[in-house]
């Protein structure tokens, strides 16, 4: 859908959208079925652990500290959502006794996620993912990409599907 707002540059434009921006989405892909959203998934011998999510568009990695009692899908999802970082976490019930964690970033290539967990090898085994090599223990459901369009013969690329500055 193409629309204009008050103050838009007057003119006649030929617009061709070749690619819509997408937000990367990852899900847990553990060979072990996660049977409950309340079961502890972390190493019980570790008191604290830190989930680190690195994105090219973020100056510093997002660090989410979890205590021993915060390693269930419910608690991990809550902690990520409470960080209010542009990354959302949800839990999907695949079927009775089988749950997965899904993480979704904001639109655009700069928001691709690389995830690691420090201080808890069990959680790292569940959540680790490298977006540069597309390897790890999460599975990519949706690949991040920027919007690409052509306006009057000019190729334009933006991280979002809302383009407010071309033409001006």
Question: What kind of feature is each model-predicted range?
Answer:
Residues 1-100, 104-168:
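Bacterial flagellar/type III secretion structural subunits and associated motility module proteins
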